[in-house]
Amino acid sequence: MNLREKILKNGLYSSLLLGINNQTKTTLHDMSHMVNSSRDEIVHASMYSLLQNSEFAGRFRERGLEPGYVRGILENILDEMFKGDFSEEHTVRIARMTFDLIRIGFPPRMLIMIMFILSQEIVRHTYPNSNQVKAILQACGWLLSNMMESYFTIEEEVFANSLGITSASYNRLLKLTAEKIYRNIDKELA
């Protein structure tokens, strides 16, 4: 399976699993005006939370990236959440955005924190009803699933290129390592 097929398969799988349908898309698109009217507050509060994290702030300082870059990332994610259509091209845009974030040094936990902090601020500043909250969570889940798939795709490529390990071998090693850690977790965490 090539890169595009793998990414698109995950996008479709995530949409189905999360129950994203036309109603979800309509709800998100209808909410975009609420989000846009609170955009500055949402982005500012999210930036403040993220930049309070020393690791996150350190990554930006190390790379000489300005706060405007963080703002751009958050605004791009907002656009993808509320104006995207969960199509194949939307899935590819999320993969490209994620590859760029990984390229500048964002580990998965930072991607997760970005999504949850941003979602929290969206809810805090837009006062959504329960159907809107559900749609926000669905969009967040879909974006995050596609971000993680992009990350794992890069990780598998690294193993394949540097060690000659196939995707199946990588997954087997992952499972075996998880089993070993699981068996020893009490000793490791004591």
Description of each model-found segment:
Residues 67-80:
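Conserved alpha-helical segments that form or flank metal/cofactor-binding pockets of metalloenzymes
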Residues 15-69:
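N-terminal "first-domain core" detector
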